[in-house]
């Protein structure tokens, strides 16, 4: 009798172990449909016209960028660092707007009043509101004003330069380095046309910045009542349809420079030309800027790109408590595309995945290529998490299966 009980127990134990092993290799116990390999065909929007000729620009470095997407639409040595003269004041103005209030009083130090022309000409100790000085900075490009603003916001010119470089890093201006707040020539003070377009794109989002740079003229006064007349010297603002303005620049080392912005319908563009001639060729920067903007508005149109809806097609999961998972489709994107460009969308998704699966971990990517070059990639995430199958989970299912069989009897 004793041996019979042991034999029965051993048989039951062996049966349970056998079921567990079976479950480990053939989970789940319950019947499920076979999940096929996940696959999607690529999408293509083909070019419908020939590529236009390269622009003939005076500038040594130039860039044209779409503000919304950050896509570079045209470039000429756009990644090459060069001195950028008073276009530096774009960053000076933005930092002052973000880190001070318009009504704050700003005084001129001995360092500020020592700056060379172009300058406001205020005397040491003179005080103005921050708002008035930012108009002096951007309309007349006053070098002494830039130092006064920098010392007020940063504690010193050097401290303000640190803030400028921190902001540049935040904005991804990786080839940009600031030394001065006014853009006067200094060793290591440089940027690229692409970085300056990114900075201008960021500036276009600041309504106070746009209001300042679009002011035609303004009279300001110090606290003692001395008045100063300011006139906007941005000829682009009044000569180009849709122009938003932004900032001119010139030094002996940088040459004539201009960073501009313009908007027509739903397309907003920023441009940058560096070293666009030296005296007496002051107008070349305007010729270059018009050529860049015309190129952008003539050839590029915004297009909404939607990805294939694969949200209802399951992706097979191996070694998981579930044998499938559904995927989330990324939101549509909007891109400026020209008729001479070909857009390809490649779905780089696996045939299956192995558990554990988390909603925060991408399982694949969607790659957008323009004219064969990768423009950007977008991660694809699962819509639910799937835990990895474990011994305890299998044991629970075995017991549940036994109980269900027992209850049926």
Question: Which residue ranges define each predicted feature?
Answer:
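Structural motif marking the loop-to-transmembrane transition
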Residues: 3-6, 130, 391, 395
């Amino acid at each position: 009798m004793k041996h019979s009980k042991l034999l029965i127990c051993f048989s039951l134990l062996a049966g349970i172990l056998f079921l567990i092993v079976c479950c480990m290799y053939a989970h789940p116990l319950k019947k499920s449909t076979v999940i096929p390999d996940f696959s999607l065909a690529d999408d293509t929007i083909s070019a419908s016209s020939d590529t236009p000729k390269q622009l003939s620009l005076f500038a040594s470095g130039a860039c044209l960028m779409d503000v919304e997407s950050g896509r570079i639409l045209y470039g000429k040595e756009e990644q090459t660092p060069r001195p950028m003269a008073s276009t530096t004041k774009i960053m000076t103005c933005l930092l002052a707007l973000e880190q001070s209030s318009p009504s704050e009083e700003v005084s001129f130090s001995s360092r500020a009043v020592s700056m060379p022309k172009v300058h406001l000409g205020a005397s040491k100790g003179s005080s103005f509101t921050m708002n008035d000085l930012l108009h002096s900075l951007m309309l007349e490009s006053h070098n002494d004003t830039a130092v006064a603003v920098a010392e007020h916001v940063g504690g010193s010119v050097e401290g303000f330069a640190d803030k400028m470089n921190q902001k540049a890093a935040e904005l991804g201006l990786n080839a940009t380095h600031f030394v001065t707040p006014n853009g006067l020539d200094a060793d290591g003070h440089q940027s690229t046309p692409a970085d300056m377009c990114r900075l201008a794109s960021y500036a276009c989002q600041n309504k106070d910045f746009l209001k300042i740079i679009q002011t035609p003229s303004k009279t300001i006064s110090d606290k003692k009542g001395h008045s100063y007349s300011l006139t906007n010297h941005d000829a682009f603002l009044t000569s180009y349809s849709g122009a938003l303005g932004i900032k001119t620049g010139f030094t002996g080392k940088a040459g004539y420079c201009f960073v501009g912005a313009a908007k027509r319908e739903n397309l907003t563009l920023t441009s940058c030309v560096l070293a666009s001639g030296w005296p007496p060729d002051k107008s070349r920067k305007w010729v270059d800027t018009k050529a860049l903007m015309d190129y952008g508005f003539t050839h590029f149109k915004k297009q909404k790109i939607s990805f294939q809806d694969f949200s209802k097609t399951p992706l097979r999961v191996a070694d998981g408590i579930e044998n499938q998972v559904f995927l989330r489709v990324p939101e549509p994107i909007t891109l400026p595309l020209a008729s001479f460009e070909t857009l390809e969308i490649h779905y780089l998704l696996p045939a299956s995945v192995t558990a554990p699966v988390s909603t925060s971990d991408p399982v694949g990517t969607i790659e957008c290529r323009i004219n064969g070059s990768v423009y950007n990639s977008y991660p694809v995430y699962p819509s639910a998490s799937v835990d990895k199958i474990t011994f305890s989970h299998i044991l629970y299912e075995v017991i549940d299966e036994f109980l269900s069989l027992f209850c049926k009897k």
